[in-house]
Amino acid sequence: MSTMTPAEIVSELDKHIIGQAKAKKAVAVALRNRWRRQQVAEPLRQEITPKNILMIGPTGVGKTEIARRLAKLADAPFIKIEATKFTEVGYVGRDVDSIVRDLIEISVKQTRETEMRKVRSKATDLAEDRILDVLLPQPRAVGFGASAEHANDDNNATRQTFRKRLREGQLDDKEIELDIEQPAVGMDIMAPPGMEEMTEQIRSMFSNLGSGKKQRRKVKIREALKLLTDEEAAKMLNDEEVKTKAVQNVEQNGIVFLDEIDKITSRNHEGGGGEVSRQGVQRDLLPLVEGTTINTKYGMVKTDHILFIASGAFHLAKPSDLIPELQGRFPIRVELDSLSVKDFEAILVATDASLVKQYQALLATEDVKLEFADDGIRRLAEIAYAVNEKTENIGARRLYTVIEKLLEEVSFAAGNHAGQSVTIDSAYVDRALGEVSKDEDLSRYVL
């Protein structure tokens, strides 16, 4: 679990997302409250439930990006899913309980990796021993006394020399034959609606087939060391302990990001079949968000303390179109702002992995130096903003379309211009995009 303060979390998010200070603060405080709750004494700790967040804002302003970056910072079980994937129980499609099942799978994988890192050093030593046993088989006993001791000393000295060479990577490309444990057979079974639990049991039954069998393989020492380290680390793990920790981690620290929640609202009150299904998904989500117990293959999982962050553009609907019970489960509401020309400029150059840096790095692989003048950046931002205003407003995603069109010729002919420099100024931008951006009909299809 992350121990970062809200200010540190916001600072990390600022490296990748421009603006949206209110949304960043809300998720930073929510994430910090997870840690604060763990410091509270037990009787009161159970009573402190997370305050779920509803993020409202137009498409392309950073809602999903905040979730993606938060997942990396959280150091906790985190899942991002689209609400549109789910249907009411009884309809064809996934039911909402699968959210928790997917989250527990993520947690088990996360917990297993954490536990394996703890024993990695010891597992590496054991893996090295197994490789050295193949390279230097133990000599037969030659008798007793001084001669046997001398042979053992020689063997140990040779073994240490080879271990040193192995650690320095001098033997990486040498091939050896090893008995390597086969991974369990993977089998995917399509689950009929409402029968996910039974399908999960069948899948786990088949997954045990073939596990534990060994196969003789010829591999390079570099690969052998990795395979044997993983095998030795897995032997040291207690699977039951991993499962218990994973379930506890989900229950206490789990975070679910529900994207596109506005798409399951009732947009009118005519009560068509689609409306019934959408309301049904909301009703199914309600106990999950409120706190319930879900049966998974790793045991029962309580959702009382899982944090839910929902987001939606709410173009055609309003948050008040959600059923009242669900509205009440998202007490913190944050509105994200539409992007301005200044924001577009910052997105192009100010973030850690900005679009400009990405394209410069891509073309540098062909020895083409791409330079952006300040007036070129400004003009590019103005065109993206203007096209958004005249056509559909898709936020920062418009920049991808505009910059792709701008660099179309440069990217195509990069191989012929090795060693050259290309400067993108306002005149270049106008030449490449001017006509297209002015013609509204054309910009609808091209930009």
From Swiss-Prot:
SMART domains xref list: AAA, ClpB_D2-small
Compartments where located: Cytoplasm
Record-linked Pfam families: AAA, AAA_2
BP GO terms, sorted: protein unfolding; proteolysis involved in protein catabolic process
Entry's Gene Ontology cellular component terms: HslUV protease complex
Keyword vocabulary terms for this entry: ATP-binding, Chaperone, Cytoplasm, Nucleotide-binding, Stress response
Gene3D superfamilies: 1.10.8.60, DNA helicase RuvA subunit, C-terminal domain (1.10.8.10), P-loop containing nucleotide triphosphate hydrolases (3.40.50.300)
Positions bound to ATP: I18, G60, V61, G62, K63, T64, E65, D259, E325, R397
Entry superkingdom: Bacteria
Predominant location category: cytoplasm
GO MF assignments: ATP binding; ATP hydrolysis activity; peptidase activity; proteasome-activating activity
InterPro entries documented for this protein: AAA+_ATPase, ATP-dep_Clp_protease_ClpX, ATPase_AAA_core, Clp_ATPase_C, HslU, P-loop_NTPase
HAMAP family: HslU (MF_00249)
Subunit-level organization: A double ring-shaped homohexamer of HslV is capped on each side by a ring-shaped HslU homohexamer. The assembly of the HslU/HslV complex is dependent on binding of ATP.
Protein purpose: ATPase subunit of a proteasome-like degradation complex; this subunit has chaperone activity. The binding of ATP and its subsequent hydrolysis by HslU are essential for unfolding of protein substrates subsequently hydrolyzed by HslV. HslU recognizes the N-terminal part of its protein substrates and unfolds these before they are guided to HslV for hydrolysis.
Family: Belongs to the ClpX chaperone family. HslU subfamily.
PANTHER family assigned: ATP-DEPENDENT CLP PROTEASE ATP-BINDING SUBUNIT CLPX-LIKE, MITOCHONDRIAL-RELATED (PTHR48102), ATP-DEPENDENT PROTEASE ATPASE SUBUNIT HSLU (PTHR48102:SF3)
Name assigned to this protein: ATP-dependent protease ATPase subunit HslU
Organism, scientific name: Burkholderia mallei (strain SAVP1)
Lineage, top ranks: Bacteria, Pseudomonadati, Pseudomonadota, Betaproteobacteria, Burkholderiales
